[in-house]
Every structure is written in structure tokens, then in C-alpha cells.
Amino acid sequence: METVNEPETGEVSKDAVIVKQEKNNEYCLQDIDDKLSESAEDDGEDDTNDEDDDEDSNPKKNTQAPLELMAEFLRAEMAREYQLAKKLCQMILIYEPENPEAKEFFTLIEEMLLMEKTQNHEQDGENSDEDSSGESKGESDEELSDESSDEGEDGS
């Protein structure tokens, strides 16, 4: 009668699994290194102008406006400094020409600037009307006071 060690035949030892995983990792790492070196060497061109080439050849490359610029834009918008907000929004659109929020804000800011401009013209018009009407009102007040003083003299 032979005794068979069932746990050893049915199970793989932990050490064997670890060794196998280490071998797989070595192969994976080596494959990755090989692929990286191949991709770096395959163009055979001078890499000094890669930054310029990447921008021209890859128009879908996402360039984002600096967060500081966006934060400054929001501060200007919240403070209702629309001239500054418009300039900052234009700068954001230079970085991100397809930014839908910046496009929307730009049109709204232009509308707000037009509204402010018309309000300023109306206020200037009212101020000039008040100045001219104030003079005529002052003249009429003087005439009334002259008449009342005349009446006082006539009545006595």
C-alpha cells in the first residue's frame, strides 16, 4: 500500500507561484523596456524640435489655461470688473479656443459692458438735464422770491 500525499499533488506550493510571478514580471519589465527603447530610437530624427513638432502635428493636444489665470478671471467676474474679466477671458480663449464656458462668458461680458456703457450715457444725459433744469428751476425760485418780496412791499 502506497500512501499518497494528497495536499502536495493537488496544490501548488506558494514558493513555486512566487517564482513564476517573478519570472513573468521580469519578462513584462523587459518587454516594456524594449518597447520604450524601440519607440525612442525608431524615428531616427533629431529630437531638438520635438515640442514645436508636437504642437503642429497634434492639434487635438489639450492645452489648458493656467489655473491662476482662471482664478483671476473668476475674481474679476465676481467683483463685476468686466473690462478686466474680458481681457482675462480672451487670454483663456487663447489657451483653450474651444472652451464653451469661456465663449459663453465672453459674450455675456460684452453684453454687460454694453449695458454699463448705455447706463453711463443715460446718467450723463440725466446729469446734464438736471444741470440745465436746475438752473431754470433756480431762476424760477428767484423770480418767486422777488414776487413775494414785491407783494410784501406793496401790501404794507
UniProtKB/Swiss-Prot annotation:
* Species per Swiss-Prot/TrEMBL record: Homo sapiens
Stretches of Acidic residues bias are at 39-56, 140-156
- InterPro entries on file: ERICH2
Q: Return the annotated region ranges for Disordered.
A: 29-66, 116-156
Which protein, by its recorded name, is this?
Glutamate-rich protein 2
